[in-house]
Amino acid sequence: LDWALYKNFVEEVDITAQVVNTTLSSDDIAYFSPKMKDWHLTLTDVNADVSGPVADMSGSLRSVRTGADTKLSVDFAAQGLPDVGKGHFKADISELTTSAADVDRLAAALTGKNLPDEVLRIAKNAGKIGLTGKFDGTLTAFAADAALATEIGGATCLLQVSSLRDGCRGVLGDVKTSSLQLGELLENDLLGPLSLNVHVNGELSSEHSDAEVSGEILRLGINGYDYESL
């Protein structure tokens, strides 16, 4: 055993492990990886196979729980940890269930920022959230394919986000909803169920947004009436 490698634990020490019905704390791992010291996350019911160093890890999480409502099953590969902001991730999510409160707490732990108030409010209105899908990229440039299920309706999304010039990001995507209870989501009594197909092609930055949006509203409830093929 070469103890000198532990001075560069994140890049040099290979981890090969099978975890069964285990509880893990980021505070313990932070002893070897100080960048995780502010995460303060506890994972329970962990069943996983993991291999590689922290900076280039892959594996299968058959189950893991955190917070009050979050459960995850996923095959994954991650490069660049523990620097989440610069890391590259691949994930094939077979099950993810969570809630607004858990997402807010995870966002604060991993990025140092809570969700914006409006986003948090809308997420709470959705109730319990379920997700399956695939992700490949960084947190700011990625391709994703997801199916979302909530207590007030569902949606599917194909999304590609790319880095352009001067901090701009290109956004290309297709979104479909089926009987999404829009009024409950936005707290607007005039709105009812929404089913639509939308294609988006645009650019986003901290200073401006510009997008072409096309699609079809298959169904929209307004003031108690359902309108179709708008």
Residue ranges of each PLM-predicted region?
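Extended lipid/amphipathic-ligand handling interfaces
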Residues: 1-17, 34-36, 43-54, 61-65, ...
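Acidic Ser/Thr/Pro-rich low-complexity disordered segments
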Residues: 6-13, 103-111
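Charged, low-complexity, helix/coiled-coil-prone segments
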Residues: 17-21, 100-105, 133-146, 175-178
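Gram-negative outer-membrane beta-barrel proteins
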Residues: 21-27, 67-69, 97-101, 141-143, ...
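Flexible, solvent-exposed coil segments and beta strand-coil junctions
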Residues: 25-30, 39-41, 52-57, 109-115, ...
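Exposed alpha-helical structural elements
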Residues: 27-28, 102-105, 118, 229
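Intrinsically disordered, low-complexity regions
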Residues: 90, 100-103, 112, 168, ...
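Short beta-strand/loop motifs in extracellular/secreted proteins, especially
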Residues: 171
